[in-house]
């Protein structure tokens, strides 16, 4: 039996006086964290770094919690997404043009509070968001 399709990405956050803000990307009507499929021979952390750079232009990320991650339950044709925590101080994001699509992969981005992210993200990402909030807030 074939295993799950592996994807990897990052919960990108920045610290503000009002608490952490999480980078969300919208493609059509769906909000998500930056992520993509793991290439053959690529480890998942390298995939996460590559996908964040491809989808947001961010390359100055710090991974303050190292290789700690959370995964989604299988969804959409047995895909499992692994997320790492990545910190940035950058506020403005550029949505680069995808060479395959000839346009940006996403339509907009938003820096969201925990409550805003909880409302915008699909239910499958709730455990990932909650883990990020607990970890980043230190509780």
Q: Where are the predicted features?
A:
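The catalytic Nudix box helix
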Residues: 33-67
